[in-house]
Each structure stands twice: as C-alpha cells, then as structure tokens.
Amino acid sequence: MDVGDMGDAGSNGRTSPAGRSLREYRQAPDCRHSDVHSRDTRLIPASPRGMNHEMASAHPTATAPASTQPVNIVPDPTVLASDLGKSFQRSAEEIVPWFVAQMPRMYFEDTSATEVANHLRAIIAARASGQPLHLTLHSDDRRQWTIIREGNKPGVLAEVVRSLPMSPSLRAAKIHGSKDGAIVLDTFEFGERSPFTGTTPEQTEKLKATIAFANSHAKDWTESAIRAYFAGCAADYIATLTPHRLNKHRLLLQSVSGSEGTAVETEPELEGQLTRMTIAFSNARARTMLERCAHVLSRGGINIQRAYLDQVADPPFGSVTMLGFVIQTQDGKSVDTSSAAWKQVAHDLTRIKWIDSESIWLANRHEGMTLDEAELILGLCTLSHQHLVHRDRLLFSIERILATAERTITITRQIADLFRARFNPAAPLDDAHFNKRAAALRADIGTKDDPEGTATILVALLDAVEATFRTNFFLAKRFGLSMRIDPSYLRDDRRPELPYGTFFVIGRGFFGFHNRFKEIARGGLRVVKPSNAAQHSRERERVFDEVYGLSWAQQQKNKDIPEGGAKAAILLEPESDITRCVKSFVDSLLDLITDDPAVRKQVVDRFGSRELIYLGPDENITPDHIEWIVSRARARKYAMPDAFMSSKPGAGINHKVYGVTSEGVNVFLEVALRARGIDPRKQPFTVKITGGPDGDVAGNMIRILDRDYGNNARIVGIADGSGVGEDPDGLDHTELLRLFKEALPIAKFDPKKLGKHGAVVPVEAPGGVMIRNTLHNRLKADAFIPGGGRPATINESNWRDYLTKDGKPSAPIIVEGANLFLTPGARKELFAAGCLIFKDSSANKCGVICSSYEIGASMLLDEKSFMPALKRNC
C-alpha cells in the first residue's frame, strides 16, 4: 500500500509545487463535518492516469500555430467529475480489501460502522490525492479526535499524544495498528464521559453477566460491590470489556486504591506473538500517563499494537486511570517478562508518574542512561545550584550547571555512579573505597580548565554526593528523590548559622527543602507556586534561602516552647499540580524517617541516628493535605503519625478554624494603636492588609477586627494573589466576612458593596499586577498587617517606596503576621523613619505555641480521648 512518507508539521496556506494550497488537498469527500489535516507539506504528484488528457492537449505547444481564437482552458465539469470519481474508485478498490484484512478484529468491535466508513473515506481521499497518510479528524464538537499515521514503530504513539490538547481532559483512548505495521489509527475522546446507569437493555445484560461471572469465578466480588464499581465507570468502558477483564481491572484498582501508586500486570495475549499489559495509576492525568507510558515502551524498543485508556472512580480517594496495551518486540515476538530489559521497562512504568520531564529528556539525549540515573543527575545539579548561587548567580545559573553536566557527561555519570555505589543496599561502598574513588574524580576534575566554572560545578556535584547521609534512591516505588544531607554543604556567609539537619527532595515539577535548627524542631510546610516562568526563575535562586530564613525565624519564635525552629518549602513549576507535589514531597521525606523495616533495608544510613520531623500547615496547604499527610504517615509506619502534622481538621487545633495566629497578631495591634494614641475600641482607625480573606492569617484578622472593634476598624485595602480591593471609607465588613466564610479571594468582592471611591481590581485587569504589588506602599493607613506575601517583599533596595512624599511611613505601625515580609535591613530603616514594627517572631508566634500543645497532646492521647478535651477547652 503506497501511503507516502510521514512529515513534519506544516501550516495552511502554503503552496505545493503545482501551485495549489494544502487547504485544497485537505478536502475529503463526505468528511465535511471533520477537520482533516495533513502535517506534511510534500505532496506526491498525481499519476498520469489521473490527469485529464483533454485538458493537457488544450494547451498550445511551442510549435503549434498561433490561433486568433481564445483558448478555452476551463475544464468540462462532467469529465472532471468522472476522472475524480475513477481516481477515488481505484483507490477504494485497492484500500478497502487491504484495510478489512489488516486491521485487527478489536478495531471493528470498538468502532461503529459510521466511524469505520469515515476513516476509510479519509484514507482513500489522501491516497487519491497523492498525500502522505498523516491525518487528524475532529468531530463537530471537537470532543473526539482520530489521528491516522503511516507506520507503526516505537515512539509513534508518544508523538501523537504529545500533539493532543491539554484541555478538556482526555477521558478515553483506543489505539489500533494494522497487522502489517503500515498504519496506526488512534481515537481519543475528551470531556465528560457518559456514565454507566444500568438503564439500557445492553447495560442491564452486562451487569447480569458480570454478576453471574463473579458467582462462579470471583466470589469475593459481591453484587453490591459490582454495582458500586460499575457506577464509577463510563458506559462505553463497561460495554467494551468482558466480565473477566472487568474483574482483572477491579483487582488492579484495589491494589492502588488510596495509595497514589501504580500497578503493572502482564499476561500472554491469545492471538499471535503478543503480550497484554495493564497499568493502573491512582490519581493521574490520563493524557500525561498515556504519553509517558508510550514513551517508556518506545525507550524499551516495544511496539504498541493496540492500546486503551479509561478512568474509573475510586471514592473517596479520587480516580484510577486504566491503561491497557497489547505489545510485542520490534522483531514481532511476545515480550519476555523475565528479561532484565523488560524488568527495567516495568520499573520505569511503575515510577513514570513521579519522574520529572527534564529527567526524561536528559535520559533520551544520552544512550544507555536510565531514567533513575537522569533523575539523580538532575537532583545533584539542582542541589548544587543552591550551593553555588551566592558565588555568582549568572555564572552558576541552573541552566549553566545543567549544560556543564551534559557537556562533561562522562565524568558527571561517574559522579552519579559513585553516589549509587555508596548507597547501594546490596553492597554499599565503604568509606575507604569511596574516598579513593572520590579522590580520583577530584584529580580528573582538577585537570580541566575553568574559565566558565566547569571544575567548580563538577566539584560541587561531587561534594553533594559526599554531603549525603541517606537517600531513598533504591526504593522501587518512591514518589520522588530525597536526600538527608549535611547542612554544612549549604552554609555560606548569607547562611551563617549551622542547622541541625537538612532534607532535599526533588520530583516531578518541583523541588524543596526541610531544614531544622534542633533535633526536635517544629515549623510549617509551604508551597510556592509562581504564576509564570520568569517568576519561577527568580524563586528557584532563593529556595533554600527562604527555608533557611523561615526556619531561623521559627527558631527565634520558638524560644518559649520545647521545640526548635524548622521550615519546609516546595517550589513548583508554574503548571504543576499542588496536591501531587505535596504528596511527592511528604512521601519522599517519610522514606528517610519511617521505621518500616522493609524500607529501612533499602536505605543505607550514614547519619546513624533516628530522626523525627514535625510539620505544620503554611501557604497553600489545605485541610485535605493535612489529613492525607497524617494518614500517609500512619500507612508508612512512621513512629508518631498523629504528631507528624499539626493543625489537623479532626483531632487537632486547626489554625484557620480557631484563628490562633491572628489572635496573637491582634493583641500586638491593639497595643501598638494605644501606644500611638488610638483606643481601637472607642476610636476609628484604618488598616491595610496583604493576604486574602480566604487565607488563615488575613482572613481571621478580618473576622477578629470586626468582632473586637466593629466599624471602628476601617479596612482600606486588601491585596492577595487574585488582586486588590480598596476603599478609603473602609471595605464593607459584611461582604469581607462572606468571602472569609466561603474561602474566596478579594477579587470576588461584590463591587456593589463598594463606596463611591472604592474599587476592586483583579490581577487580570490592565495594570492589575502592579496595582496589587504596590498596595502595601501606596495606601495610607494607621496600621499595616502583612498577613501574606513573599519573603523580602520590603527589602534594603525598596524600603523607601513605603514612605510618603514627606518621608513618613505610609502606615506608622507594622504588625508582621507573615514571616520575613521585611528584611532585617529594611526593618531598621523603617524604624529609623518612625515606624513602630512588631517583628514576625513575636507577633505571629501564637500559632506555633498552639501547635506545640496540640502535638504534645497527640503524643499522649488517641483521637477518642483528644476530641472531648478539645471540645471542653476550645
């Protein structure tokens, strides 16, 4: 079958050598309701038998006598239609028998007769017009895409899926390759699925058949459980699978339910030299997992003959994505699942949900590099960046570090290999042999010229290996890569105090640190989510600076409680999912501190001491995250799971519910106002706030200001991630309290509730970002409460912006509800300018004091005993 060559992406409006645009070639008969696209700009010329010879002879030749009559070059429409019909007929006579013979039986079972006819029309149209077979068909509502490509080889499916839209969500996929490998035909469905309801005769029959099957072959699968499973499935998913296959999927779902994990199962396929593989992913984006699995199979030299994708509900945990593949080796044989090559593929499939895209592309660029090795190299480079950034932020940017690691890939891989050897639980490298190999690497690095910092970067990578005490690298089902490192590795002039312990974690779309200044220390976990790449680039230079600064501030704040100071922060890439990254970070941390014997066997410990970590909620951590963290710690056999996380919604003292941090901030605010001659319970005063009504500190501050001072408290401005609300007469309290109760940001403030000089400006509005970012400087007020915002928002270089034209503070009182909003230098300058400032380590310490009591109680009481005590005292 001559279907031409596959090509690269083209664009409409280009012209073929014959002078016709590609748009003309893309019109397929009877496909008016589908968009048919060919991405190849090279067109195979029409064969001579397809030309209109009368038209050709109508053109004068060089020797023909001149004619005084005008030449009629308009073709006869009847003849032209006849020629085209014959061309399509010949193509149909060649293609249809081949198509029916070569497409697998399952294609015809999965595809309606109408869709089969549409697929054939598109293929015939491409063949008749001499196009390469590289087509995309869309349904009218664009909820179904069919992509037809020439040739079926490893990597084709991954390339196809990569071209699909990210929105709406992919809900189902069916992939079919012809038996001779000539074409692959992929159908993708997007948007909301049609659920199984059991109301049609076909659905009722399938339900009965499955119940009957279970009575004979799966007695643990009760009728009520079958009905519950079916209720979480799409109707076409149930219709497609046999009861036997549905039961297998049910068992796979159970194996990953609530775990965030992955299960891979293989079995021989009945027809030919094929292997069936089914993968279940807990709470994973369907499109991404299909692309990543196809990529892993391509790396392993595995051909995909058929593939299926569906999602099944997994209440209350979310959903499970089911991927089915019918595969074979490149030489047309079934897969040897006992081979080392396949075991590597299966391992990669198990972990692919959690591997960063950068690691995938790094492995692709270097033959023989595994995904685990690439992940390790990326991790060492990221950690080294935090080590080097203060020396020269441009010379040692993350981009230059990664480029250097790749440019000297041989020695980089030797460093990674040394890491693996040192922590290989089967035979860990002893100190003597490690030091010998490290010295040899240092000698090799020392011979390199260093005009661009090459040697410095490579030494930093090697130093990172030496600084690692513990890693989860060899855990087969880890959610990320974690290392317990010597904190002296990150010590420099800007971080002079030596912490007790530092953990580094990197995963898909994020990296972060946990840092503590005492063996037993407490501090929150925050998520930093930049809105764009430029902001992410700035934030990644200071991730450990932020963690260090916050944990040191916490150390000062905790002087009145037994625990020292700690903090954890995760920096997300702009498009990363917060919940996935939080789970990856926390689970990777648990890998290094759990008492589970099965885990400890795989973790070589060069620190030599058991460690306990105590977390609390901070920015972007929700009650659902808190509950998951505690339950996950329990499932992972952490020594004190109830004490692992404070501010628990159930058996805990939830900061947002009780407003414990804001209660303390308010005490300092009242004292400050009285010191300035304002009795807030009798006199009006104005206040501006950063942090939204949906936040813990700012939201509860709004509630407390209204509770204690009523209309005397005039909130003249609020800024949060969504925008600003400003009103010189004071924002309406009732509306602000509505936003607080409904957990809505300030941009949702009802404009009808504004005074005549008030305004709500979302960040999306022209100038909205600038207006939001300057509110704390622009507005005049009696007091300013930073209840949210990034560290160092007011710093040594911009503190003057906080002053009015006459050099006075725009608000003469600052009560720091948010940590590190002001740098020490800025704080000194503003104090000298007449600003009364209550520092974060004093003003907002009520939250951590409360958490200390909560965790102490959690160590002594179970939930049954804790809850009555909470109700009596709170």
Predicted regions: what is each one?
Residues 56-60, 64-509, 514, 527-540, ...:
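Non-catalytic interaction/regulatory segments
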Residues 273-275, 523-531, 567, 640-654, ...:
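Gly-rich Lys/Arg/Thr-decorated short loops/hinges at beta-loop-alpha junctions or inter-strand turns
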Residues 372-376, 489, 494-524, 556-580, ...:
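Conserved phosphate/anionic-ligand binding catalytic regions in large, soluble enzymes, centered on
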Residues 401-456, 657-722, 732-760:
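Extended, regular secondary-structure scaffolds
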Residues 547-683, 707:
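Glycine/serine-rich phosphate-binding loop and adjoining beta1-alpha1 elements at the start
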Residues 549, 577-578, 669-688, 705-714, ...:
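Non-transmembrane, aqueous-exposed alpha-helical and coiled segments at domain scale
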